[in-house]
Amino acid sequence: MNAGDEVIVPSYTFVSSALAFVRQGAKIVYADSESDNPNIDTSTIEKLITKKTKVIVPVHYAGVSCDMDAIMGIACRYNLLVVEDAAQGIDSYFTSPKTGLKTSLGGIAHMAAFSFHETKNIQCGEGGLLIINDERLVRRSEIIWEKGTNRAEFYRGEVNKYGWVDLGSSFLPSEYTAAFLYSQLCELEKIQLSLIHI
């Protein structure tokens, strides 16, 4: 992602969907929502694509899946990355009308992000989860996650010492946070059922 690159985001979303890209100097291009829900209207995406477009960010609003067949098809035609904003998509699925295949949200695009904000079904106050579904993105993601170091490669025995190789930050959860999240995952079905009745 370079300054001036463009990212297509639905017009109805929280600021976090665009913020990571804006911090890298990207220009946000807003796509219309569907007429019957706030998800991205896939029929509006192609006319927004330019030579500077790099990423499409479908937001699965309230855990309702976007048309990922259409979005991934467009991304393939134009050689674009897709980053699913699955912040509200824990335990939600996309069923392909083409194949009938049911896939977890976050498991379709090149990358996906889930939120553990206190307003989500599974929460720990703040934080989230990054899913990497494209091998080309794993190394850089690990470096950013490990404070800019190649420590993950060191732990796997791929290098004999680790060092700073890029920019990064500290994204590691505490053991308490992980335990709190794990206990909710163990009770996910019960949590989801209780929310249906609210």
Model region roles, listed by residue range:
Residues M1, N79-L80, S170, K190:
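A subset of signal/propeptide-processing and intrinsically disordered low-complexity segments
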Residues M1, L105-G106:
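Hydrophobic beta-strand core residues of beta-sandwich domains
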Residues T53, R77-N79, T103, G127, ...:
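A generic hydrophobic-helix recognition signal that picks specific residues
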Residues Q88-P97, L101, I108-S194:
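Active-site region of PLP-dependent enzymes
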Residues N2-Y93:
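PLP-dependent aminotransferase-like
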Residues I196-I198:
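Conserved small/polar residues in nucleotide/adenosyl-binding loops
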